[in-house]
Amino acid sequence: MSMPGINVSNLLNEHEELGLRLLAGEKGLTNRINMSEINRPGLSLTGFYESFAHDRIQIFGKGEWAYITSRIPEDLKNIAADFFSFHLNCIIFTHGNMPPSIFTENCERLAIPLMISDVSTHKFITLISGILDRSLAPRTMRHGVLIEVFGIGILLSGKSGVGKSETALELIERGHRLVADDMVEIRRLSESYLIGTCSDLLRHHMEIRGLGILNIKDIFGIGSVRDHKLIELIIRLEEWTEDKDFDRTGLENPTEELLGVQIPLIRVPVKPGRNIPIIVETAAMNQRLRKLGKNAAQEFNQKLSNYLQQGKVERNPP
């Protein structure tokens, strides 16, 4: 698992929706942002720096701007001295408000990027929080195929050559959608949600033994692919051998941990004559039913228990 960070320059140059313009501190554009939380330093500007989150992006909204611009020069000098005594990665003023010159001077001297945006504070925080959540989410790479089947994101896993790509190709021909083949990039966006995607280089491509590299979007159309998908089920394809024990009732609920999230796991034996794509489709529909609270295996088990209990009573009347 990796915990990536991004440079301040990434926010400035690659996210036009933020509307950022650099005023000072160009030498600090390589400063790293390692957390998705932001900080509004309102209380800190009054002199209370206990628990000051200096390692976050500092956002100056209308309130902070109005406060510092209303101070007399001597007070503002003291505010700046205290504020810039901390190591800061960047400072952003919203609503197009221009910071005082003492902020510009300190940011230039200390190589702290100082930027402004015409976007309102509330909208800006919403936008940048989403960007940081996506960019800084814990992530890992997983060998397999990620495909959307009946709206369920399924990660097909298993040893090389077991038939993952061939199974996915048949599912695509049936109208389902490819997300990633071979290497799946997985990000944890919350405590219980994993998003799978593909690298730009491999996106929409598959490798099939005997055919080579295929462009799925060109062959099957734009409706056969998507860029990312929530991972809700893992299906592990395993070569069938007599000594392996596979679940035959559905009462077991095995899971596999990915980035600290438990994902439902189904182990499917692979051998000649088995129609794996239709098994995957059925697993997807069954998973949708389970999400709605309907579990066929448990219902059948309950019926069986009731039947056996009823038979026991009939054989042993009071």
UniProtKB/Swiss-Prot annotation:
One of its GO terms (molecular function) is protein serine/threonine/tyrosine kinase activity. Keywords: ATP-binding, Kinase, Magnesium, Metal-binding, Multifunctional enzyme, Nucleotide-binding, Serine/threonine-protein kinase, Transferase. Residues 206-215 are annotated as: Important for the catalytic mechanism of both phosphorylation and dephosphorylation. It comes from the Bacteria. ATP binds at G158, K159, S160, G161, V162, G163, K164, S165. Its cofactor is Mg(2+). Mg(2+) binds at S165, E207. It catalyses: [HPr protein]-L-serine + ATP = [HPr protein]-O-phospho-L-serine + ADP + H(+); [HPr protein]-O-phospho-L-serine + phosphate + H(+) = [HPr protein]-L-serine + diphosphate. Pfam families: Hpr_kinase_C, Hpr_kinase_N. The active site is at H143, K164, D182, R248. One of its GO terms (biological process) is regulation of carbohydrate metabolic process. The keyword Ribonucleoprotein does not apply. Residues 269-274 are annotated as: Important for the catalytic mechanism of dephosphorylation. Its EC number is 2.7.11.-, 2.7.4.-. Homohexamer. HAMAP family: HPr_kinase (MF_01249). Belongs to the HPrK/P family. The Walker A ATP-binding motif also binds Pi and PPi. Both phosphorylation and phosphorolysis are carried out by the same active site and suggest a common mechanism for both reactions. Catalyzes the ATP- as well as the pyrophosphate-dependent phosphorylation of a specific serine residue in HPr, a phosphocarrier protein of the phosphoenolpyruvate-dependent sugar phosphotransferase system (PTS). HprK/P also catalyzes the pyrophosphate-producing, inorganic phosphate-dependent dephosphorylation (phosphorolysis) of seryl-phosphorylated HPr (P-Ser-HPr). This is HPr kinase/phosphorylase. The lineage of its organism: Bacteria, Pseudomonadati, Spirochaetota, Spirochaetia, Leptospirales.
